[in-house]
Swiss-Prot record:
PROSITE patterns: WRKY (PS50811). GO terms for molecular function: DNA-binding transcription factor activity; sequence-specific DNA binding. The keyword Nucleus applies. This is Probable WRKY transcription factor 43. It is found in: Nucleus. It comes from Arabidopsis thaliana (Mouse-ear cress). Keywords: DNA-binding, Nucleus, Transcription, Transcription regulation. Residues 24-89 bind DNA. Transcription factor. Interacts specifically with the W box (5'-(T)TGAC[CT]-3'), a frequently occurring elicitor-responsive cis-acting element. Gene3D superfamilies: WRKY domain. The gene is WRKY43. GO terms for cellular component: nucleus. InterPro entries: WRKY_dom, WRKY_dom_sf, WRKY_plant. Belongs to the WRKY group II-c family.
Length: 109
């Protein structure tokens, strides 16, 4: 052993991040998932605070940040960190009746 430590094993895998900007009067946009706000802070050189959210689904570690732009107040920037490990609840509520109907119709073919 030469005394050097391999830190590559100790590094935590970073979650994928992506952000987008949306023109909206509402600060919180409905994306189909349920979120719990866990923080808010003032950001240097910004008129608007940044809000922090976590997905409420058990064992899902996705987070998002939401902030209105100071220079373009009609724009909200949303940044997601991570990938959901469960289906979108709103999508499932929409699809469930359709899937039951298709299952019913398949009995006749």
């Amino acid at each position: 052993m030469n005394g050097l430590v391999d830190s590559s094993r100790d590094k935590k895998m970073k979650n994928p991040r992506f952000s987008f900007r949306t023109k909206s009067d509402a600060d919180i946009l409905d994306d189909g998932y349920r979120w719990r706000k866990y923080g808010q802070k003032s950001v240097k050189n910004s008129l608007y605070p940044r809000s922090y959210y976590r997905c409420t689904q058990h064992m899902c570690n996705v987070k998002k940040q939401v902030q209105r732009l100071s220079k373009e107040t009609s724009i909200v920037e949303t940044t997601y960190e991570g990938i959901h490990n469960h289906p979108c609840e709103e999508l499932m509520q929409t699809l469930t009746p359709l899937l039951h109907q298709l299952q019913f119709l398949s009995k006749f073919t």
